[in-house]
């Protein structure tokens, strides 16, 4: 019987209407009179309002309509206290008090009977009580009133219940209301106390049973109906309700509603959680607050809980309460005891373990175990309560622990307990095991195992012979223990409840009887369930492993049905195991599968499959993509692949074997399918999982080898499984995993497995249905390819059925498909799948073939259109064409259409990128909507061709769509344009948007009238205006939507935005552009709509972007300003004034263009570094510089645009613009000199010329001042030395050139005006501008002759005028327009006016080279000169200036004014200057600097040691040795104690390491293994002391040594070796540029017997070139690694990381360099190869130029390295300048450029990569030429060192000549181009490589 509160009887239309009216009338008191009137109309239909005697209201039978009114009133609680009190007094209380005796009309009574509802009296009482409870909860002041009503109610019930059954029915409804709604705590407590007193009176319960059993009035239909429904009215039922109310109240007080468990389980869990925290094993997810709240609630109600527990103990101790007279009463009695036990579980939380109450609780639980635990009549709730109570006690006492552990297996073995109950009880039992040691649970599991027993013949063993013997208390459970209060009232069959069959009797039965077998099956099922539940909930690896071990042993030892139970349980346990245990479990399943297959045990095999499916479902649902998941997936796939393994490949096999293996494979299909997502869900993502991808492919190959084909019986039987597998499978061939060796299909071992002739024939027939016989020629096509095609047909056809037809295209990306000549088959298959997909859509299910899934398929096809593989791209275009024409609606979806438009944008961006980053192209482009990344090859021609092709196809496809669904498509296009608003605000070109606009405006046949229009004229008409108006409406609608709030709300939001932005600025936080954009949009909207204060809004609209001062914020702001000026012209002047003010303030603040923070230092002043070319760092710094200056560019463009728009509008505006222009250009003297500042400067000057032109036309007084400031501002740029354009962004350089030309032309137009006001200054400016234009143009096209270039010869008067203007300008002008005559004039001017030039370091050379100087005094002015570069300063120590103290003093001053780290680099040069140090200046410099930098002192000492001897053996002393020894001794003696300790630690450590070479000498002729053993032995002895470092790595500290890294190097007489050290150092983060500490392993070579000083010099020069090129952002790559000479013939060399020499490649059998690249990076079409080739080109160009200039010889393959990124690196510089090995000049070529190098670049001098190499060589050469003197200054001091590479000053002459200083830049470019041509495959290069092969065995 249902206890329904919604009452079907009152669900009539009238009842619903009354309920609705009641809710409205008791709702919010907006119209109190109206509500009151309605309520009165409803309630006054009740008899209580019209009866003459309301005290007899119960005598009037309650009708259906009155019932509906009363229940409706009870549902709606009034919102006012007065109304509640009125209803309570007038209606609720009177009817409530009369419910015990209320009469019911026959109609109402019969309706309830028909509907099988409870008695109307019970339900009416329930509703009225619920009303009072909720009213008291809402208005606690009613507590006393309602409490009084309830007291009166109890009194009436006690009077009436013996007379009328309605009294008991009413009481049942009353109690149930409080059970369901204990929300009013105090009222529920009050009621519980009343009921407790009632039942404690034993007479009440006795009287109830007496009346029910004997009274004639209590035998009507209602009593029978309650009995039949299982709710027999009895004292047991009332007691159960009261006990349930008690539990409900406690649960409410403890707030257990969020848990969902019963009370005892909740209390047990809380104790467990507390235990975990106490033991410090709590999980991170555990909620401590819940535990704290729980204990707080317990403490708050302690006394009340104590009273409850005492009453519960009283009831539990009275055994006579148990009423077993009927099934229902027995159930109520046991449930009552369960509720009281749940209550008693509070005792451990409120009492000490020593208390009497706790002791009583323990006894009650013990007694319950003895009496009820194994009884066959108790309810599951009592069993759970007993187990929960005993488990809880385990946390506090061990008294019952042993009993519970012993009894639990017997409980599980009980024949009357269900498996469901066992599962529930086992969970509770497991929780109670945690405070015990692990032995307890092990013991329990073994006890379970003992129950799983079978006899020798496999029959079940009687496991319980005498149960009494195992019960700890020794008491017997007999039926006589339960006294029947009234046996005469027992129903038939009650005796069966008593379980009078003893265990002994059961044991004596025939073990093979049917009953026993049934019991045994139940026993096994329960034991397995309990064991697995315990293991999974205890969740420790040891217990899980034990459980699995026990259960696996039982398989095949019992019945087949029970095998299924055990296997199923093992499967459910599997996801909780470790990887190791799971692996063992899989092996078990595998072994059982083998056994089942071998003995043909289909039942066992079926059970195994079911168990595997359970594992699959569990892993899919709860552990998807976990390690366990993939282990199981791999196991299933491996099992499929291993099926049918053969020893001999390509061997014929019989059809019977093929069929048998096919059936074997089929057993794995269901578990595999269950493990994978079903079609329609997101498929398994294994795009980057090489192992899983290959396993899936091999599985499909094995399918077809063993007879799986479409239409075959085995495929039909397993089609649903194959469908899911196919849906998640990768394509059988693709570019992943990268198959660099291009292995053919013939090499796949699975495809080469033999098959039967019948299967091969069937597979051929299958593929013939797709491919005609011409494509698949049986005789020429191998069986491997046949099987591959068959597998592809099978997989892709089934995948198509699963809703995916797009994967076939990916086959073309695999080189083996193209090389295997089956690409035509794949093309046919691809088309077939698309056509099949189009057919399936018509009849497919919506889950797979809905519009989104169809659009997704097209989306996948569209993404292939940009693939670099031509065959795949062609197939993709063909596939898209068919797909869109077959299913036009597929493109009418934002997913596919947006992808198409985004791809157009991405490809257009890629073309821009190839211009902007010619030598460093982007390969990855992200589609803006889907965020999908597409890979684009570096070829600019490919990019342009692909865009053109896609654009053409896209037009056709969108035309088709517009003709089919014109309006829908245009709405999508509008959405696309609107969605990209954020991008388009910052990006100038969005090709996809442009395309969308074009297509939306087309007139198509869908436009019935316009398409038939006859038009004339050059332009076709379009519908773009209608589209734009619709789009404008849509934008306006969005705009209006954004401002639907009131102006006050918007103002408040604006205030919050400005406050947040300024707060973040103050705190130095990054400002998000969107925040600024949102603020500007809101403020502009408010301003334009006229709802705000204009002045205040304009102030913020202008000032905030300037305060944020980012490129994005100012770009958006300038657009907003122009919008305001257009839409709100009355405030335009106000806004312009504010912009002008902020512009000038930003100039005063020295930010943006007017900041010098990003200026580049001169190359010679920069810190030289031994590190790889850092293009990422260069780009980062360049980006920072550009972004810092861009804001001013946007403002300048705003000025220029608005100036042109308001020309001649007013004098006031002209004055404002003039003021802005003047302030900007007059401050250009302090503006940035970064290369990126040039264009912005010239934009400003162009704006100024516009203002000048306007002023000239209006005759303004500012003409003269503007002219002068323009000239001065323009000339301020040329104070920087001439430099090539920065970076490789040709678009930027071309724009720079364009702006400079525009400025030059604009000034020429104003030449008369400029000449009149500026005189020669204007002419000087013309020289500079012409030179600048030529410089930029030359850089863009160095080999093309520029008309009029180098024609501006300087005259003497121009030189003099420029010198008078600024000596620095004169020097820079000479550098640009050199002539000997002009130089002589300038030298004279510098000598004559030396003090004017002291601020210009570059003027010093001119000053000291004057031939007219006759005495020292003439050079006294040098003492005032600005410091020059460290190299120049060092060169002033050379003999030429040794006699001039002014020069020597200046050089000391100049060096000391520099950072010591700059001088650090030039230690070799400084040491060599000691040769000429007659005055001691150099010695003093060294000693003074050593005091400042201890690292400098160490480097000096090592270099001095290396220069003491002329020979490598340290025998022939150098004449400088005494000087070096003296200085070294003085230096060391001057060290402080800490410096001396550091010095001793460092040199001792280094001596220990280098000393290994000496200890290796006795092993020189021994094997490498013996040498290595000796090195490792010595390395193990070295102690790493604090702060020690390698001499080659002074900026890092050695923290560890790889003691086993020692490696002897090849040498005939010496013992060099290599070792690896762990270095800790600070490096720059490539992204942020900030220093971060890293630890890395660094290998170093300790060389003996070779003079390393030449290598040091060569690497110094390479580092200098690196700095020169990085200063202009040139895209070349060099790696000046570190070499330090530490003693005669000794040195430390850093090993290039991740590199291998070319000769080692030859030794490793790599045929050529190109083959190495393809094997390592993939074929030429891969992005990896293209990136590596790009790196190769850049590095080869850099080293080629250096090789020529420094004359690197001995360039055999042993001295050329290749790193893992494709860079070509040079090492070993023993032969440079004027020395060649052995005097043999085989290498009479500029540099090494072999055929294999050219092959990597494309194979010929016409390929793009080769042309890039040529261009980079030319630009690297041009960039180096202006720094020839710096390079010579680095070499000059070393000439006296005695190094063999020098031939005196001839070396310097030759070096200078290689720079071709006499040639123009254009001539020098042609010269370098000729050198490249000469080097390409020179016969000398080939001859030298052959010489090295013959003499040293170095391959080439």
Curated annotation (Swiss-Prot):
Residues 1623-1629 are annotated as: G-loop. Residues 1531-1648 are annotated as: Pleckstrin homology (PH) domain conferring phosphoinositide binding specificity. The modification Phosphoserine is found at residue 459. It is an enzyme of class 2 (transferase). This is Phosphatidylinositol 4-kinase STT4. Acts on phosphatidylinositol (PI) in the first committed step in the production of the second messenger inositol 1,4,5,-trisphosphate. STT4 functions in PKC1 protein kinase pathway. The gene is STT4. GO terms for cellular component: cytoplasm; mitochondrion; plasma membrane. Residues 1617-1884 form the PI3K/PI4K catalytic domain. Keywords: ATP-binding, Kinase, Nucleotide-binding, Phosphoprotein, Transferase. One of its GO terms (biological process) is phosphatidylinositol phosphate biosynthetic process. Belongs to the PI3/PI4-kinase family. Type III PI4K subfamily. Coiled coil: none annotated. It comes from the Eukaryota. It holds the Pfam family PI3_PI4_kinase. Residues 1751-1759 are annotated as: Catalytic loop. It catalyses: a 1,2-diacyl-sn-glycero-3-phospho-(1D-myo-inositol) + ATP = a 1,2-diacyl-sn-glycero-3-phospho-(1D-myo-inositol 4-phosphate) + ADP + H(+). Present with 846 molecules/cell in log phase SD medium. Transmembrane segments: none annotated. Residues 1345-1530 form the PIK helical domain. SUPFAM superfamilies: ARM repeat (SSF48371), Protein kinase-like (PK-like) (SSF56112). Its EC number is 2.7.1.67. Residues 1770-1794 are annotated as: Activation loop. One of its GO terms (molecular function) is ATP binding.
């Amino acid at each position: 019987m249902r206890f329904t509160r919604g009452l079907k009887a009152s669900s009539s239309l009238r009842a619903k209407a009354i309920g609705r009216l009641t809710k409205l009338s008791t709702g919010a008191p907006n119209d109190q009179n109206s509500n009151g009137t309605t309520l009165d109309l409803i309630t006054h239909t009740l008899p209580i309002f019209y009866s003459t005697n309301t005290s007899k209201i119960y005598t009037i039978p309650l009708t259906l309509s009155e019932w509906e009114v009363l229940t409706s009133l009870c549902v709606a609680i009034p919102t006012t206290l007065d109304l509640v009190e009125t209803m309570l007094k007038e209606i609720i209380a009177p009817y409530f008090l009369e419910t015990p005796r209320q009469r019911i009309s026959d109609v109402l009574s019969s309706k309830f009977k028909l509907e099988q509802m409870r008695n109307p009296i019970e339900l009416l009482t329930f509703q009225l009580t619920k009303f009072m409870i909720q009213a008291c909860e809402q208005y606690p002041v009613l507590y006393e009133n309602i409490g009084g009503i309830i007291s009166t109610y109890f009194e009436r019930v006690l009077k009436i219940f013996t007379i009328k059954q309605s009294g008991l029915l009413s009481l049942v409804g009353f109690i149930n209301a409080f059970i369901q709604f204990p929300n009013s705590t105090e009222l529920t407590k009050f009621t519980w106390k009343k009921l407790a007193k009632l039942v404690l009176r034993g007479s009440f319960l006795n009287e109830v049973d007496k009346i029910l059993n004997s009274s004639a009035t209590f035998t009507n239909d209602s009593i029978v109906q309650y009995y039949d429904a299982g709710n027999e009215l009895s004292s047991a039922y009332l007691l159960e309700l009261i006990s349930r109310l008690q539990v409900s109240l406690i649960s409410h007080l403890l707030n257990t509603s969020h848990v969902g468990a019963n009370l005892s389980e909740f209390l047990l869990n809380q104790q467990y959680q507390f235990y975990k925290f106490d033991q410090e094993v709590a999980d991170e997810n555990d909620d401590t607050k819940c535990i704290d709240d729980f204990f707080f609630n317990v403490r708050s109600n302690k006394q009340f809980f104590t009273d409850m527990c005492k009453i519960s103990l009283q009831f539990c101790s009275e055994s006579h309460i148990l009423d077993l007279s009927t099934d229902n009463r027995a159930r109520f009695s046991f449930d009552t005891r369960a509720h009281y036990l749940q209550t008693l579980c509070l005792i451990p939380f409120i009492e000490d373990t020593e208390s009497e109450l706790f002791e009583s609780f323990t006894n009650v639980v013990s007694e319950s175990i003895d009496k009820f635990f194994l009884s066959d009549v108790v309810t599951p709730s009592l069993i759970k309560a007993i187990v929960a109570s005993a488990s809880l006690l385990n946390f506090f006492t061990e008294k019952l622990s042993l009993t519970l552990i012993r009894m639990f297996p017997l409980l599980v073995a009980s024949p009357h307990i269900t498996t469901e109950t066992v599962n529930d009880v086992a969970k509770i039992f497991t929780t109670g095991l945690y405070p015990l040691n692990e032995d307890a649970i092990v013991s329990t599991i073994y006890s379970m195992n003992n129950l799983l027993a079978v006899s020798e013949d496999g029959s079940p063993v009687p496991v319980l012979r005498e149960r009494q013997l195992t019960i700890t208390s020794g008491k017997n459970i007999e039926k006589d223990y339960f006294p029947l209060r009234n046996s005469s009232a027992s129903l038939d069959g009650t005796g069966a409840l008593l379980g009078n069959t003893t265990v002994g009797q059961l044991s004596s039965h025939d073990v093979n009887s049917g009953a026993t077998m049934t019991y045994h099956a139940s026993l096994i099922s329960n034991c397995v369930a309990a064991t697995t539940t315990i293991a999974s909930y205890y969740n420790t690896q040891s217990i899980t492993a034990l459980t699995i071990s026990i259960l696996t042993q039982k398989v095949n030892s019992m019945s087949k049905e029970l095998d299924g139970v055990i296997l199923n349980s093992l499967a459910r346990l599997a996801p909780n195991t470790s990887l190791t245990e799971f692996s063992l479990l899989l092996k078990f399943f595998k072994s059982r599968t083998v056994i089942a297959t071998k003995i043909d045990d289909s039942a066992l095999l079926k059970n195994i499959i079911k168990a595997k499916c359970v594992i699959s479902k569990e892993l899919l649902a709860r552990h998807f993509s976990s390690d366990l998941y993939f282990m199981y997936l791999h196991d299933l796939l491996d099992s499929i692949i291993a099926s049918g393994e053969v020893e001999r490949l390509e061997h014929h096999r019989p059809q019977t074997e093929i069929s048998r293996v096919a059936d074997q494979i089929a057993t794995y299909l269901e578990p595999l399918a269950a493990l994978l997502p079903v079609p329609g869900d997101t498929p398994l993502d294994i795009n980057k999982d090489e192992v899983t991808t290959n396993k899936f492919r091999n599985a499909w190959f094995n399918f077809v080898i063993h007879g799986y084909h479409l239409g075959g019986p085995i495929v039909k039987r397993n089609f649903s499984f194959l469908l899911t597998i196919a849906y998640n499978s990768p394509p059988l061939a693709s570019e992943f995993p990268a198959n660099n060796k291009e292995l053919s299909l013939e090499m796949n071992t699975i495809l080469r497995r033999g098959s039967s002739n019948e299967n091969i024939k069937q597979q051929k027939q299958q593929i013939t249905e797709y491919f005609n016989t011409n494509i698949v020629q049986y005789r020429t096509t191998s069986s491997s390819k046949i099987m591959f095609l068959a597998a592809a047909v099978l997989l892709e056809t089934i995948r198509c059925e699963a809703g995916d037809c797009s994967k076939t295209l990916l086959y073309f990306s695999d080189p083996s498909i193209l090389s295997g000549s089956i690409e035509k088959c794949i093309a046919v298959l691809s088309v077939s799948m698309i056509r099949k997909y189009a057919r399936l859509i018509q009849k497919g299910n919506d889950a797979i073939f809905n519009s989104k899934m169809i659009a997704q398929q097209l989306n996948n096809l569209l993404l292939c259109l940009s693939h670099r593989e031509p065959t795949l791209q062609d197939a993709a275009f063909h596939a898209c064409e068919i797909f869109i024409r077959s299913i036009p609606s597929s493109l009418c979806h934002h997913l596919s259409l947006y992808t198409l438009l985004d791809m157009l944008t991405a490809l257009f961006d890629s073309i821009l990128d190839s211009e902007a980053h010619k030598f460093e192209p982007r390969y990855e482009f992200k589609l803006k909507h889907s965020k999908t990344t597409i890979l684009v090859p570096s070829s600019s021609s490919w990019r342009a061709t692909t865009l053109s092709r896609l654009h053409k196809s896209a037009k056709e496809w969108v035309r088709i769509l517009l003709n089919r669904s014109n309006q829908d498509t245009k709405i999508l296009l509008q959405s696309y344009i609107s969605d990209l608003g954020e991008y388009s605000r910052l990006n100038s070109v969005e090709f996809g948007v442009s395309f969308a606009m074009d297509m939306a405006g087309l007139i198509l046949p869908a436009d019935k009238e316009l398409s038939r229009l006859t038009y004339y004229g050059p332009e076709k008409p379009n519908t773009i205006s209608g589209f734009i108006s619709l789009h404008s409406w849509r934008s306006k609608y969005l705009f209006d939507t954004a401002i639907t709030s009131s102006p006050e709300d918007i103002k408040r939001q604006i205030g919050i935005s400005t406050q947040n932005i300024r707060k973040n600025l103050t705190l130095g936080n990054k400002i998000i552009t969107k925040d600024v954009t949102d603020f500007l949009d809101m403020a502009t909207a408010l301003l334009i709509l006229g709802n705000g204060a204009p002045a205040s809004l304009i102030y913020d609209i202008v000032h905030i972007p300037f305060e944020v001062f980012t490129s994005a914020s100012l770009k958006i702001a300038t657009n907003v300003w122009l919008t305001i000026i257009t839409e709100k012209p009355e405030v335009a002047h106000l806004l312009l004034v504010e912009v002008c003010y902020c512009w000038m303030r930003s100039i005063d603040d020295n930010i943006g263009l007017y900041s010098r923070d990003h200026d580049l230092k001169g190359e010679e002043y920069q810190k030289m570094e031994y590190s790889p070319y850092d293009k990422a760092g260069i780009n980062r710094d360049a980006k920072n510089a550009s972004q810092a200056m861009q804001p001013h560019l946007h403002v300048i463009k705003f000025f220029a645009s608005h100036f042109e728009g308001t020309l001649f509008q007013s004098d006031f505006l002209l004055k404002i613009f003039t003021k802005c222009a003047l302030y900007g250009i007059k401050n250009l003297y302090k503006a940035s000199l970064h290369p990126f500042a040039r264009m912005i400067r010239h934009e400003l000057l162009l704006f100024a010329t516009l203002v000048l032109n306007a002023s000239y036309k209006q005759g303004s007084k500012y003409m003269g001042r503007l002219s002068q400031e323009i000239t001065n501002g323009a000339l301020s740029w040329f104070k920087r030395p001439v430099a090539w354009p920065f970076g490789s962004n040709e678009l930027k350089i071309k724009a720079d050139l364009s702006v400079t030309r525009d400025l030059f032309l604009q000034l020429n137009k104003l030449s008369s005006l400029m000449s009149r006001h500026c005189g020669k200054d204007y002419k000087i400016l013309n020289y500079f501008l012409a030179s600048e234009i030529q410089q930029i143009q030359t850089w863009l096209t160095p080999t093309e002759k520029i008309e009029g270039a180098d024609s501006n010869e300087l005259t003497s008067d121009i030189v003099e005028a420029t010198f008078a203007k600024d000596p620095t300008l004169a020097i820079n002008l000479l550098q640009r327009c050199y002539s000997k005559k002009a130089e002589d004039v300038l030298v004279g001017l510098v000598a004559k006016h030396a003090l004017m030039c002291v601020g210009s370091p570059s003027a010093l050379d001119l000053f000291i080279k004057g031939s007219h100087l006759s005495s020292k005094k003439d050079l006294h002015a040098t003492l005032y000169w600005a410091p020059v570069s460290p190299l120049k300063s060092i060169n002033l120590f050379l003999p030429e200036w040794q006699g001039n103290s002014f020069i020597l003093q200046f050089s000391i001053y100049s060096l000391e004014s520099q950072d010591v780290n700059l001088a650090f680099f030039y230690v070799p040069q400084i040491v060599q200057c000691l040769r000429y140090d007659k005055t001691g200046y150099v010695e003093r410099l060294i000693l003074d600097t050593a005091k400042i930098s201890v690292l400098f002192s160490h480097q000096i000492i090592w270099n001095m040691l290396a220069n003491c001897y002329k020979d490598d053996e340290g025998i022939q002393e150098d004449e400088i040795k005494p000087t070096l020894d003296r200085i070294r001794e003085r230096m060391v003696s001057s060290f402080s104690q800490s410096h001396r300790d550091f010095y001793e630690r460092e040199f001792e450590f280094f001596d220990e390491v280098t000393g290994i070479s000496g200890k290796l000498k006795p092993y020189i002729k021994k094997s490498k293994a013996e040498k290595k053993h000796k090195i490792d032995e010595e390395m193990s002895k070295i102690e790493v002391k604090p702060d020690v470092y390698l001499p080659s790595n002074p900026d890092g500290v050695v923290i560890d040594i790889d003691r086993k890294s020692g490696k002897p190097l090849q040498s005939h007489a010496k013992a060099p070796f290599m070792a690896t050290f762990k270095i800790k150092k600070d490096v720059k983060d490539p992204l942020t540029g900030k220093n971060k500490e890293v630890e890395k392993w660094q290998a170093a070579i300790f060389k003996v017997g070779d003079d390393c000083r030449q290598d040091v010099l060569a690497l110094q020069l390479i580092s200098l070139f690196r700095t020169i090129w990085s200063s202009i952002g040139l895209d070349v790559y060099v790696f000046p690694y570190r070499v330090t000479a530490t003693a005669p013939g000794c040195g430390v060399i850093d090993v290039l990381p991740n590199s291998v020499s070319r000769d080692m490649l030859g030794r490793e059998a790599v045929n050529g360099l190109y083959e190495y690249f393809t094997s390592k990076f993939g074929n030429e079409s891969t992005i990896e190869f293209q990136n590596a080739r790009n790196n190769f080109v850049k590095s080869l160009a850099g080293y080629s130029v250096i090789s020529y200039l420094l004359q690197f010889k001995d360039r055999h393959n042993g001295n050329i390295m290749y790193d893992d990124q494709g860079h070509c690196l040079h090492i070993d510089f023993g032969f440079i300048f004027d020395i060649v090995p052995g005097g043999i000049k085989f290498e009479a070529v500029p540099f090494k450029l072999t055929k294999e190098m050219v092959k990597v670049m494309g194979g010929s001098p016409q390929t793009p990569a080769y042309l890039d190499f040529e261009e980079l060589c030319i630009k690297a050469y041009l960039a180096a030429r202006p720094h020839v003197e710096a390079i010579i200054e680095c070499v000059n001091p070393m000439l006296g060192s005695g190094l063999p590479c020098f031939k005196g000053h001839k070396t310097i002459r030759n070096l200078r000549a290689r720079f071709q200083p006499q040639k123009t830049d254009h001539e020098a470019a042609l010269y370098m181009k000729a050198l490249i041509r000469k080097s390409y495959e020179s016969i000398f290069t080939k001859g030298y490589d052959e010489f090295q092969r013959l003499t040293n065995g170095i391959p080439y």
